[in-house]
């Protein structure tokens, strides 16, 4: 097979067509309401397992889109996830994304309380942006903090994206978060199991931003 040069917009369209065809062939066609998120994650990772392990509370995608259209900010647990979120999409929506992990006040709070920056950053996010979209791609402790705040402090974020990757406390934290969100009516998108990562968190955010901003086709995002 001879490699060919393709324009970015054509690459994305062709990739998504391949993803759609392969999902259909495997009997894993996602429901229309979650398809954009599932396909965006597979496009980012080339991993079709996400068609099986991404779980959504009822109406989670619609809640995320509505929140972004209402200017709810996105708060991530890593600067890597933050850097992967589409800036043109956020600009079109008049929206913002932020991460507190490198904030000196968060570092000081974590040290004073003998906890992690991930915990302190989510505590600050809950205090300053209680209606935000919280996107976690790295730290299980961030998910556990969010779950605790939902249960004990009445936190009601617009959406929780829980996709940390790893082997220690990852599966358990995701299961707890999903159960707590489902029990308290908090919209959630969670990658069950060990897989995930900051790139997956950013991909889910981008799928929501593109939908909210009407940028579903690559040319809508300025690609040629």
Which residues does each predicted region cover?
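Short glycine/serine/threonine-rich phosphate/pyrophosphate-binding segments
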Residues: 81-84, 141-146, 167-171, 197-201
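A short, well-structured juxtamembrane/interface segment
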Residues: 52-67
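Long, charge-dense
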Residues: 90-129
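Buried hydrophobic positions in well-ordered alpha/beta secondary-structure cores of metabolic enzymes
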Residues: 77, 161-162, 204
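Charged, compositionally biased N-terminal leader segments and the immediate start
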Residues: 1-31
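ADP-ribose/adenylate-binding Rossmann-like module
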Residues: 158-167
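C-terminal functional extensions of proteins
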Residues: 168-224
């Amino acid at each position: 097979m001879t490699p060919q040069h393709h324009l970015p917009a054509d690459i994305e369209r062709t990739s998504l067509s391949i993803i759609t065809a392969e999902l259909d062939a495997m009997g894993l066609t996602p429901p229309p309401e979650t398809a954009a998120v599932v396909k965006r994650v597979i496009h980012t990772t080339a991993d079709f397992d996400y068609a099986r392990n991404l779980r959504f509370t009822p109406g989670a995608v619609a809640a995320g889109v509505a929140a972004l259209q209402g200017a709810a900010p996105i708060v991530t647990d890593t600067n890597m996830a933050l850097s992967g979120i589409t800036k043109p999409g956020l600009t079109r929506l008049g929206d913002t994304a932020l991460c507190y992990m490198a904030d000196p006040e968060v570092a000081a709070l974590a040290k004073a309380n003998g906890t992690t920056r991930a915990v302190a950053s989510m505590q600050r996010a809950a205090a300053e942006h209680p209606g935000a979209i919280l996107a976690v791609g790295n730290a299980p402790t961030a998910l556990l903090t969010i779950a605790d705040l939902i249960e004990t402090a009445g936190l009601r974020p617009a959406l929780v994206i829980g996709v940390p990757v790893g082997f220690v406390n990852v599966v358990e934290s995701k299961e707890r978060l999903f159960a707590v969100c489902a029990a308290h009516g908090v919209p959630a998108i969670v990658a069950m199991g060990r897989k995930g990562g900051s790139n997956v968190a950013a991909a889910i955010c981008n799928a929501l931003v593109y939908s909210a901003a009407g940028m579903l086709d690559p040319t809508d995002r300025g690609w040629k």
